């Protein structure tokens, strides 16, 4: 129902005369409007998708990709809706919606493409997180988005995602570790190791000559 363009087909109100009720005349159109069912359907789609977009967590790569796909679908649906409104009778409403969506799309993709060029990876197009950990070993390198905003990384500790990229990050030995955000790129160095339930974890923090206070609280479960 919410995806049918027929819901937004303009309806014309024409005065009916008893003598000429079978004769249609375009000159006698009093008012043209779009049925309320179209707006109800459009509102229902947005009411369902926007809370879903806000409730989806980004603690794993899969969930973050799903959230990004929901965002793309929401923008695409409203863009198609705006095109239908422009082609119909609600030209001002459709034009304003198209202008808003075009500006939003431009700002979004400029930010994502900048991340892609900075990281030399396509991951930012499908993962809407804006903080990344990039590591390099002797023979390979890897990069994953993260949810924390502080420039630190603890290898083999509190691993919430089990995808191949996260597994690589938490199981390899690095010669270089970098924290990358929207406006900064910080090199991290290993400062200490600690053991929890037989698993050895390494703490990476920004390189500094000053002392770095660390407070590590062990989680209730450790997944490796």
UniProtKB/Swiss-Prot annotation:
Occurrences of domain CoV 3a-like viroporin CD (ranges): 131-188
Report domain CoV 3a-like viroporin TM positions: 32-127
Spell out where the chain crosses the membrane: 36-56, 68-88, 89-109
Keywords of the record, alphabetical order, are:
Host Golgi apparatus, Host membrane, Host-virus interaction, Inhibition of host innate immune response by virus, Membrane, Transmembrane, Transmembrane helix, Viral immunoevasion
A GO cellular component annotation here is: host cell Golgi apparatus
State the membrane topology.
Multi-pass membrane protein
Report what the protein is called: Non-structural protein ORF5
Source species of the chain: Middle East respiratory syndrome-related coronavirus (isolate United Kingdom/H123990006/2012) (MERS-CoV)
């Amino acid at each position: 129902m919410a995806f049918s363009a027929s819901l937004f087909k303009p309806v014309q109100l024409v005065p009916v005369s008893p003598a000429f009720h079978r004769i249609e005349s375009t000159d006698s159109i009093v008012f043209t409007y779009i049925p309320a069912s179209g707006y109800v359907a459009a509102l229902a789609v947005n009411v369902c998708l926007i809370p879903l977009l806000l409730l989806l967590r980004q603690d794993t790569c899969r969930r973050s990709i799903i959230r990004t796909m929901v965002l793309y679908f929401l923008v695409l649906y409203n863009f198609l809706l705006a095109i239908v409104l422009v082609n119909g009778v609600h030209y001002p409403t459709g034009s304003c919606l198209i202008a808003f969506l075009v500006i939003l799309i431009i700002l979004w993709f400029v930010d994502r493409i900048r991340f892609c060029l900075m990281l030399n990876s396509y991951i930012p197009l499908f993962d809407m997180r804006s903080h990344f950990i990039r590591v390099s070993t002797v023979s390979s390198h890897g990069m994953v988005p993260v949810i924390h905003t502080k420039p630190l990384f603890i290898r083999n500790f509190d691993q919430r995602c089990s995808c191949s990229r996260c597994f690589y990050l938490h199981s390899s030995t690095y010669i270089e570790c970098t924290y990358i955000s929207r406006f900064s790129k910080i090199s991290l160095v290993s400062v200490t190791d600690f053991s929890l339930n037989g698993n050895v974890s390494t703490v990476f923090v920004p390189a500094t000559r000053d002392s770095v206070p660390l407070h590590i609280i062990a989680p209730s479960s450790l997944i490796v």
